[in-house]
Amino acid sequence: MKKILCAVLALAMMLTACLAMAETVEEVIAQAQTMTNEELYAKAIEESNGKTLYGIGNSSRGKTAGASFIEMLQKIDPSYTGTIEWSQPKNNSIFTTLNADIKSANHIYSMTLIQDGNQIQTKMLDTGNLLNFIPKEWAEGEGVIVEGNDKPLALQTLNKVFMYNTVGDKTYTNCWDFVAEGVAPLFMGVNSELVGKNFLYMLTEETYANYLKNAYDALEDGAAKERLAAVVKEMEPEAEALGLEAENAPYALAYIKLFCEQYNEQTDDGPICNTLVTKSAVDQCGLLVYSKLRSVEESAETSVNNIAVAAYQDGYQGIGGYAYKHYLQVLKTSPLPWTSCAFIAYMTTTSEGFAAWGKDMGGYSANPICMQDHSKDGYVDGVNTFDAKNDRGYEWWTSADGGRLVVEDPEYCAQVSFDLGDWIDMIVGSK
C-alpha cells in the first residue's frame, strides 16, 4: 500500500512539474518579442512539425502567405511537415467565430488577421481575447513606422479615397464638394462594412476635425457655403451633447450628417469602381478602395482615364479619404502560439511574407523592407498612360501636406462609438 501511495505521489509531483513548465500564450509572446526571426522559426518548427495551424482572417491572401511561410520553414528543415489552413468568414462574422472558439473546450484557431479597430478594441483587446505580439525585428527595423501601427500590430494600411468621373465638366476641388447639395457619393453602407463607420467616428478627432474646418474656410463665399454654415451651427449643441472634445467637432458632425444623408449606398467597392470608370457615369463620384483601379479592363466605354483621384488634383482641399488597417493578433487560447508569432514576424518583416498584399497599389506596410514601389503602376512601356494608378505611397497619403487620410485609431473609435454610433444610425435610418 505504501508503495502504491508513493507511486501516486511521485506521479502527482511529475504532473505538477509538467504543468509548471507549461507556458501560457502570454508567456510565449513575452519571450517571442525578444527573439530574432531565426530563433522564432526554430521554435515554430519544433512546435508545429506534423501539425496544422488554423488561421482566420478578413483577407483571403493569408492562405498565400501561409504557403510561403511553410515553404520557408521547409528550406530550414526539409523534414518539417507542418501546414497552415486559412479561412475567411463572411458577413462580419469573424468576431462571433473567434469568441466561440475561445469559449469552446476544443480550441482550433491560433491567430487572426482582422479589421475594424472599434470592435477589435472593445470585444477583443479590452477583454484579453486577442493578444498583441510585436516582432523584435519589426520594432527595431530601420525606417519602420512603429507609432500608430504597433497597438495593435498592423500588417497593412489600406486606403479608401474620393474619386470622381471626369467625362463631364464637374470637378471636386474640396472635400466639402462631396456633400454639396445634389451630390450623392457612391459608398458602401456604414453598417455593411464597419470600417466606414470608423471613418465617420474618426472625423470628430481633433486632427481631422481641423482638416474639415480648414477646408471649409477655403470654400468660396456664396449660397453653397451658407448652406454648410447653417448645418455647422445646428451641430454645435449636438457636439456638446455627444461629449466631443475637439474644438471643430461641429464641422465634423456637419460633414457626417450630410454625408450619411446623401451617400448612394452600394453593396461593394468593385461595382462602385466599375460604375465610375464608364463614360456614362458623368459627374458621379464615390469613396472606394483605391486598389480597385488595378482591376479595370480598358475598353471603348471603360477606362481608368475616365476618373480622377481627388487628392491628386492640384489645389485640392481637405481630406482625401480614409485609411483602415488589417491587424495581426494571437488568440489567448492559441494551440500553436510559437508558430503564430513566427508567422506574424514573417509577414511583417520580410518582402516574401508581405508579397501577397504588397503586389498591389493601395496597401501599405509600416516596414519599408516589405514595400513594393507602385509609383509608376500607371505607366505602359515607359509612358504615363493611367495617371490615377500612380500610387504616391503611405507617407504622402497620411501627411498633412499630402492626401490627409483619416486614419483609424481603435482606441478613439471605441471611446466615441457608443453614443456617436447611435447618432449616425438615426441619420442613416431616416434616409
Where are the regions a protein language model picked out?
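Short, polar/charged alpha-helical segment
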Residues: 34-49, 59-81, 162, 296
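Extracytoplasmic/periplasmic substrate-binding proteins
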Residues: 247-251, 261-333
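Mature extracytoplasmic/periplasmic domains
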Residues: 322-407
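Extracytoplasmic ligand-binding site segments that recognize negatively charged/polar headgroups
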Residues: 51-71, 84-97, 107-271
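Loop/turn elements at helix/coil->beta-strand transitions in domains of secreted/extracellular proteins
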Residues: 49-53, 79-82, 107-111, 182-186, ...
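Conserved C-terminal helix/tail region of periplasmic/extracytoplasmic solute-binding proteins
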Residues: 23-33, 38, 391-431
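Extracellular/periplasmic catalytic domains that process cell-envelope and extracellular macromolecules
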Residues: 46-47, 104-108, 146-147, 153-157, ...
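Short, low-complexity disordered leader/linker segments with a strong preference
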Residues: 1-49, 431
